């Protein structure tokens, strides 16, 4: 499946006509496209999603549990996880991420906590975590998968923000490579693909794959957009044949950007040992904004976000507490990163201890 980026969308907005396959019963070009995606992502089986990672998470959880089951859930999971728990009348057992008081960030889920919970609650039927988090925190998926598999349980990883993992050594391997049983990727978040496009991957023999497929059929649109699916396939084409030429210059730009931002005297890059370096988490923790109308009040992420938008026309991904997140991707340019560096340098003079 190929589509020119400058094509008129109305001319390619087809449906399941002869020769163009059917996403819900893929036997032709869509089957081939999904098999290629599986190969690229080191998965046993991959499905295109046109209703976002949300439909993948809903289908994954429904597919590995039955009504009334217990499920071990990281408390920092996406709201779709809680929607799945509600819809399937599950009983969640919560895993709380550790908190870094210096960074003012929730950090990773530990494998030790997973093992402790599984021993305490033997009725748990599946484990659900998010890695990387919105803030870029990466948990030890391999060790968590091992802990789940010791009990014969499947591990579902919401890796929506890690669709770029595994394509350059600067970033972690993806959760398929780490032993997860179901992995969900939002290709639109960190790769060049249309909004709401995603992938669901399945691995191993701990998952009832037919049950997951059944929920995908029920929960995903019966009229999937061929524009969105062609966009996914075009993204896979890039990863398959142009990975180095796309990722190598991006990583070099990102390294330079992080190095320059690291020179700031006050605003700092917040990161942990296990971190997705594509996320620029800019922290003003412990600082005040040196303006008369703030009366020395502690600076906030919201203030920094507003300054970047209103003064420099730079839109951040989000702001929370004492930090903002600037998301980067292979689509970023030298010019864009230089604008961010210049803005932060100037604001660094206004935010002080």
Regions found by a protein language model. Name each.
Residues 1-41:
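Glycine-rich phosphate-binding segment of PLP-dependent enzymes
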Residues 4, 13, 25, 40-43, ...:
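Conserved PLP-enzyme active-site core in the AAT-like
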Residues 20, 47-49, 127-130, 325-329:
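Short glycine-rich or small-residue beta-strand-to-loop segments that form or flank ligand, phosphate
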Residues 33-34, 44-50:
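Short N-terminal amphipathic alpha-helices
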Residues 34, 172, 305:
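Generic structural marker for isolated residues within well-ordered, non-membrane alpha-helices
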Residues 49-51, 95, 319:
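Conserved beta-strand termini and adjacent loop/short-helix elements that scaffold enzyme active sites
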Residues 256-353:
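Conserved C-terminal alpha-helix-loop-beta "cap" of PLP-dependent enzymes
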